[in-house]
Amino acid sequence: MPFMNFRNFNFMPLLRPLNPVYKGAEHLCRKNIHNQVYNVETGKTIQILQDLVPLVLYRALPDAILDHHVELVIFPNSLNFPRIEGLTIYKFIFKTARLLLSSTYGSSAKRPIDIIHQLHSSMENKNVRYSMKCNWIASPNDEYTWVFHFDIDKKGIIYRHIIDNLERNRSRQCEKISALKPDPIE
C-alpha cells in the first residue's frame, strides 16, 4: 500500500456536507463570526418567543427582549389604528387585553395559544422578521386565529410587533374581523 501524503489531500469536500453554509475560506473571516453571534442572539429571542407566546394571554413577554421604544401595529391591512410606541403602553395594551379576555371568557382565557405555523425571514440591515400563525380556542364554539409578526434586530431585541389577520370561528362559521365591533344585541 503506498504511503498517503496528507499535505496534498484536499479535506474541503469532506467538510461541505457537514456545514451547509461553507463557502470556501470565508468561514474564518471576522464578518462571518459576527453573523454567528448575531444568529445566536436572534435565535435566543426566537426560542423565548416560541416558549412564551402560547402563554401571552396570562403572562407578559419579558422586558429583556423588548426595545424601550417597541412599536405595536394592530391590523395594518384592514384598519387604520394608530401605531403604538413605547414599552409601558405596549405592556399596558396586553394587560388590558388579558383583563378583557378573562372577564369575557373566564377561566378559558388561561388556555394556551397554539402556534400553527412559524416562519422567519431576513430583512434589511441584518434584521429578522419572525412570523407565527396562532390559534386560540376560547370556548367550545368560539375560536380565534391571527398572525403575529415580530421584527427583531441584530442584538435579539424586538423593535416592532404586528398583529394581523384576526379571524373568529364561531360555531363552525369563519369570519374575518375587519373591525372590532360588538356582537348584535339579540
Curated annotation (Swiss-Prot):
Xref: InterPro entries: Mug163-like (IPR031342)
Pfam (any one): MMU163
Gene Ontology cellular component list: mitochondrion
Major localisation: mitochondrion
Keywords, alphabetical: Meiosis, Mitochondrion
Gene Ontology biological process: meiotic cell cycle
Highest taxon of source: Eukaryota
Cell compartments where the protein resides: Mitochondrion
Record carries keyword Lipoprotein: no
Role of this protein: Has a role in meiosis.
Protein name stated in the entry: Meiotically up-regulated gene 163 protein
Originating species: Schizosaccharomyces pombe (strain 972 / ATCC 24843)
High-level lineage: Eukaryota, Fungi, Dikarya, Ascomycota, Taphrinomycotina
